């Protein structure tokens, strides 16, 4: 059973929520994107290598 004290009141004062900076999602996203961007940069750089 839910009571009215559990629900936020519309228009009432709300407490600011502090979220952690590093989360599992943040680590997973950056563990994939950082090497991907590095790899794409390496591929782009290799296009300018002259024989």
Swiss-Prot record:
Membrane-spanning intervals of the chain: 26-42
This protein's UniProt keywords: Cell inner membrane, Cell membrane, Electron transport, Heme, Iron, Membrane, Metal-binding, Photosynthesis, Photosystem II, Transmembrane, Transmembrane helix, Transport
Membrane topology field: Single-pass membrane protein
GO molecular function, one term: electron transfer activity
Names of the cofactor(s): heme b
Residues in the signal sequence: none
UniProt keyword annotation of Lipoprotein present: no
Top-rank taxon, per record: Bacteria
SUPFAM superfamilies: Cytochrome b559 subunits
GO biological process: photosynthetic electron transport chain
HAMAP family per the UniProt record, alphabetical: PSII_PsbF
The protein, known as: Cytochrome b559 subunit beta
Source species of the chain: Gloeobacter violaceus (strain ATCC 29082 / PCC 7421)
Gene: psbF
